[in-house]
């Protein structure tokens, strides 16, 4: 045993992957975007409402303007792999947050391997990945809540190094 044993509690893992398509209007385009997310994830997406009225964009408060779906487990890793393949395994440094999460967007959903359907059209989407370590549940549970120490919290540097090592990817500076 020449190498020091790695603590399994320090391993980073993907907690969830959130796929979001923001259409900007309710109606037919929103239902078509919903079909795209359902094809991709195999789950029924949720519609998101506008927080406030923006007259210049023609958006009213509480109008449904986007759809999103949360994917966990091996399915999340598989969809993330497809999304990173579209981005050619390159992300920018500013795609990573200080808390260790990261996100990116793609322009066309058909790049993910979904067959083009003229009745649906083409939609871009955002990928948001939430990272954590084992033991993060103690801050979220209802009974006997606890805190996670600073050394165990997920940081940007941890996630960037995990991302480079797991996907053999590049993180561009600017």
From Swiss-Prot:
Classification via PROSITE patterns: RIBOSOMAL_L5
Entry's Gene Ontology cellular component terms: cytosol; cytosolic large ribosomal subunit; nucleus
Cross-referenced InterPro entries: Ribosomal_uL5, Ribosomal_uL5_C, Ribosomal_uL5_CS, Ribosomal_uL5_dom_sf, Ribosomal_uL5_N
Compartments reported by the entry: Cytoplasm; Nucleus
Biological process according to GO: cytoplasmic translation; ribosomal large subunit assembly; translation
Residues annotated as signal peptide: none
N-acetylserine sites (modified residues): 2
Keywords, sorted A to Z: Acetylation, Cytoplasm, Methylation, Nucleus, Ribonucleoprotein, Ribosomal protein, RNA-binding, rRNA-binding
GO MF assignments: RNA binding; rRNA binding; structural constituent of ribosome
Main location as per UniProt: cytoplasm
PTM remark: N-terminally acetylated by acetyltransferase NatA.
N6,N6,N6-trimethyllysine: residues carrying this PTM: 75
Pfam families in the cross-refs: Ribosomal_L5, Ribosomal_L5_C
PANTHER family: 60S RIBOSOMAL PROTEIN L11-RELATED
UniProt-listed NCBIfam families: PRK04219.1 (NF003258)
Physiological role: Component of the ribosome, a large ribonucleoprotein complex responsible for the synthesis of proteins in the cell. The small ribosomal subunit (SSU) binds messenger RNAs (mRNAs) and translates the encoded message by selecting cognate aminoacyl-transfer RNA (tRNA) molecules. The large subunit (LSU) contains the ribosomal catalytic site termed the peptidyl transferase center (PTC), which catalyzes the formation of peptide bonds, thereby polymerizing the amino acids delivered by tRNAs into a polypeptide chain.
Record text on subunit structure and interactions: Component of the large ribosomal subunit (LSU). Mature yeast ribosomes consist of a small (40S) and a large (60S) subunit. The 40S small subunit contains 1 molecule of ribosomal RNA (18S rRNA) and 33 different proteins (encoded by 57 genes). The large 60S subunit contains 3 rRNA molecules (25S, 5.8S and 5S rRNA) and 46 different proteins (encoded by 81 genes). Component of a hexameric 5S RNP precursor complex, composed of 5S RNA, RRS1, RPF2, RPL5, RPL11A/RPL11B and SYO1; this complex acts as a precursor for ribosome assembly.
Protein family membership: Belongs to the universal ribosomal protein uL5 family.
Miscellaneous comment as given in the Swiss-Prot or TrEMBL entry: Present with 39000 molecules/cell in log phase SD medium.
Protein name: Large ribosomal subunit protein uL5A
């Amino acid at each position: 045993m020449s190498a020091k044993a790695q603590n399994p509690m320090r391993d980073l893992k993907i907690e969830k992957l959130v796929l979001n398509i923001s259409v900007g209007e309710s109606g037919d385009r929103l239902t078509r975007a919903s079909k795209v997310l359902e094809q991709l994830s195999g789950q029924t997406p949720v519609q998101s409402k506008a927080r406030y009225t923006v007259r210049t964009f023609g958006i009213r408060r509480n109008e449904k303007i986007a759809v999103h779906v949360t994917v966990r487990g091996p399915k999340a890793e598989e969809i993330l792999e497809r999304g990173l393949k579209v981005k050619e395994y390159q992300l920018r440094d500013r795609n990573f947050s200080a808390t260790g999460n990261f996100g990116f967007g793609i322009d066309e959903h058909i790049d993910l391997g979904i067959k083009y359907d003229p009745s649906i059209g083409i939609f871009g989407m955002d990928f948001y990945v939430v990272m954590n370590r084992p033991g993060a549940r103690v801050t979220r549970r209802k009974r006997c809540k606890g805190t996670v120490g600073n050394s165990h919290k997920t940081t940007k540097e941890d996630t960037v190094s995990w991302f480079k090592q797991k996907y053999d990817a590049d993180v561009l500076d600017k």
